[in-house]
């Protein structure tokens, strides 16, 4: 969503971007080997951009396709060859099947990538490697395959003393609703499910959360995103003069997003209150 400006971003978030989380340094990674899976995605590209800004980091960026070294996390041999050869100090798992409606249809693909893929990585890292899983707010009281697949992956990683960076909806990622709205000609109405409520964070905040997790003790972390925002209100703020067509939520979309699950609570705050460590009664 390259054409959205900072004021529009604030309108979507309902707040300004957090200054501390978006300015975290990467000096603690100097001299370390960092492997990223899923580096071709929006968050992956932004993270690669940040880490390559420090030429003292030994970075290996991978994805199943594209410009980076090939790594299919569902392919055990491929994982073994790449991960064991590089032997990273930090492994950031951004690879995943992330589209909720597709997950309800192609359930095995979603489970294979998000859950089995994470298992493959865990089984092929050495004892020195800290694994960070990027996850989703849909893992909190999951109602769909995508959320459930990520919840299982979270538990596996936490059981092995890894960390989880759980994201809310990241505004600037490819394929998001705002990108879709922007692509619709102004002469045509935009489709909205106005009562759907979501938490939002920015792309820079998502990358900042990853950096924070790498440099802190194992656990489950989220950006303190602020209150829920109704999609109808966002559409009215972004496109006050546009005609809107009201539609029902898509298959796989819940009406109200969860901040925490019913078994979770806030353990502690960091960077003032920008980041929250989440505890679960089952930890």
List the predicted regions and their residue ranges.
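Conserved Rossmann-fold cofactor-binding substructure of NAD(P)-dependent oxidoreductases
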Residues: 70-88
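N-terminal Rossmann NAD(P)H-binding glycine-rich loop of SDR-like oxidoreductase domains
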Residues: 26-29, 33-52
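Conserved internal alpha-helix within the Rossmann fold of NAD(P)-dependent oxidoreductases
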Residues: 76, 118-122, 210
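Conserved Rossmann-fold NAD(P)-dependent oxidoreductase catalytic core, especially the SDR/UDP-sugar
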Residues: 93, 97-151, 162-163
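Strand-loop microenvironment adjacent to phosphate/nucleotide-handling motifs in alpha/beta enzyme folds
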Residues: 6-10, 16-19, 24-28, 154, ...
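Conserved glycine-rich Rossmann-like NAD(P)H-binding loop of the short-chain dehydrogenase/reductase
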Residues: 55-66
């Amino acid at each position: 969503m390259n054409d959205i400006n900072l004021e529009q971003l604030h309108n979507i978030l309902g707040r300004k971007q957090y200054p501390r989380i978006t300015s975290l340094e990467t000096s603690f990674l100097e001299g370390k080997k960092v492997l990223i899976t899923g580096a071709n995605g929006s968050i992956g590209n932004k993270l690669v951009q940040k880490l390559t800004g420090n030429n003292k980091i030994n970075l290996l960026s991978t994805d199943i396709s594209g410009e980076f070294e090939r790594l299919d996390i569902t392919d055990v041999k491929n994982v073994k060859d790449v991960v064991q050869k590089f032997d990273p100090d930090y492994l950031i798992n951004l690879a995943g099947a992330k589209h909720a409606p597709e997950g309800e249809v192609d359930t095995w693909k979603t489970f294979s990538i998000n859950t089995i893929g994470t298992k493959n990585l865990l089984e092929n890292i050495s004892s020195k490697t800290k694994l960070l899983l990027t996850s989703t707010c849909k893992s909190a009281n999951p109602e769909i395959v995508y959320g459930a697949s990520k919840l299982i992956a979270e538990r596996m990683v936490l059981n092995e003393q890894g960390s989880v960076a759980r994201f809310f909806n990241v505004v600037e990622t490819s394929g998001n609703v705002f990108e879709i709205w922007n692509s619709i000609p102004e002469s045509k109405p935009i489709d909205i499910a106005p009562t759907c409520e979501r938490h939002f964070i920015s792309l820079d905040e998502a990358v900042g959360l990853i950096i924070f997790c790498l440099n802190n003790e194992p656990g489950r972390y989220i950006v303190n995103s602020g209150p829920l925002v109704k999609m109808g209100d966002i559409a009215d703020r972004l496109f006050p003069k546009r005609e809107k067509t009201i539609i029902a939520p898509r298959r796989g979309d819940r009406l109200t997003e969860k901040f925490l699950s019913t078994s979770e609570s806030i353990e502690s705050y960091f960077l003032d209150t920008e980041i929250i460590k989440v505890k679960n009664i089952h930890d």
